[in-house]
Curated annotation (Swiss-Prot):
Substrate binds at residue 149. Oxidizes both D-glucose and D-mannose, but is 15 times more catalytically efficient with mannose. Strictly dependent on NADP. NADP(+) binds at residues 15-39. This is Glucose 1-dehydrogenase.
Amino acid sequence: MPAPYKDRFAGKKVLVTGASQGIGEATALRFAEEGAQVALNGRKEDKLIAVREKLPKVSGGEHPIATGDISKEDDVKRLVAESIKAMGGLDVLVCNAGYQIPSPSEDIKLEDFEGVMAVNVTGVMLPCREVIRYWLENGIKGTIIVNSSVHQIIPKPHYLGYSASKGAVGNIVRTLALEYATRGIRVNAVAPGAIVTPINMSWIDDPEQYKAVSSHIPMKRPGESREIADAITFLAAEDSTYITGQTLYVDGGLTLYGDFENNWSS
């Protein structure tokens, strides 16, 4: 689908974490289609290079690669600094990287729980901290969008760590939005529902589960990564300058449905 606003982000500098696939890749593509220079973060350089090859060229220069583990402080300090140096600035941060490990709650391993929290919570806090520091030092009124989940408000059986992490993300967004509103820094989240992405292949590849998931979404289908990218770019654009501290649910109406446990417990 072509970008609706070709030059909406012309001259803007964007950093997207978890940009090697799925929603992160779609988001990077949408920003670039609309004129932004995009720094691509992920752990595997070859995957990021493959994504970069899909992005249109923009006037700001090449889209830089910023490898690193967003749950590691030294990595985040480096990749944020490298991104800013390569692009000559930074206007938008998209915290997209996410991780989940299914397990009955009585069997969850501590290392698995901590691993999910490290990526989904620490991996949001650290990039936000480093980017906000840069903005405050340079008087920049930037925008942060965090990729959360409908599980920010709806429990997901067998995914205790994931549900807990997304609840934490919601409060990170609200806290930062309130703390820095007077400095012109906006912070919002998108909360995808059931989306066709690599992280959801367990049910996407199972015809029966795919049918069951789709049947319990009011719009009767899972979403596409580009639809989440549409929401993210809206929250980054001038169209949303009076919106901060909010979570935009992009879920086909999934959060309107009450019998979640019986349909998502597998």
